[in-house]
Amino acid sequence: MNKILTTICILTAAICFAACEGEDSLQPSHADSNPFNIDDAATDEESILKRDFYSRNGCYLLFNDTLNGGELLDIGYVMTASQNNNLYIYEYLKTIEEKSLAADFVEQYLLPHLGKRLRPFAFLLVKNINHFIYEDGLLKTPYDGTENPSFVVGVRATAISMSAITEMDDSEKKDYSKVLIIDIMTNIISHQTTDTFNQFTSYGKNYYGIWMDGWIETEEEGMPLQNAKGFIAPHQGEWGTIWSAYPTVEEDVKAYINLAMNSSLEEVELKYTDYPDIISKYKLMKKLINELGYIE
């Protein structure tokens, strides 16, 4: 923990120093360069692994969060947010054997199901991920139990902790990869502007993130109210499920991706006979993930 906090202090000081230097000149350095690129002339094993991975898959492979030119990868960066309150500190993979096994997991269990439009720009493969949040000017452990997440899906990259994977058998890896794939697709689909996606969100656009009248405590009472508005899962707050609140767009998308990946149309029609909007949204999500290149 002391090592992590020391790293945080160093990073904070470096950011402040860089900000002060940036005020002297508005001319960006390396403005046209790609900080993810691998040097074509590099012949070390890691560079060859990363270069071959990109050649085969069209997405970059990272083993630390320092990019070319010294830029730090901000995995929590969100284009629509005014600020990012999340900080991620990584414990890196050390040997080329560990890195090769990590790359093999991505190629064997994730990428076969993700067409080019669904693939992250880069994968950051590390041993462990430590998550902190900024609150009231202080760095704190998250309240929701995500201090050591297994993975983090960001705009520029998806970070995966390999320590959770090394002890898994083939069946467990397949189940775990499904969870990862759902989160990767949720991140991409939630930012779509296609007609299919707009049709999907039109069912719930007046209710996303809205509280119901009155307090609902149980699934038995809350789920029919959610289903009546075309939702199949409620909002998740810091302390757990909130049946009195409708889901956000991202939560709705994630729930329907899960449904589309794991249920047939016949199963959905049987379960949600009384809720035609849910059946329609299922069909739209099935169409959407196929349009974007999900491979079963």
Region locations from a protein language model:
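Bacterial N-terminal signal peptides that target proteins for export
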Residues: 1-8
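C-terminal motif of bacterial Sec signal peptides marking the signal peptidase cleavage site
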Residues: 15-19
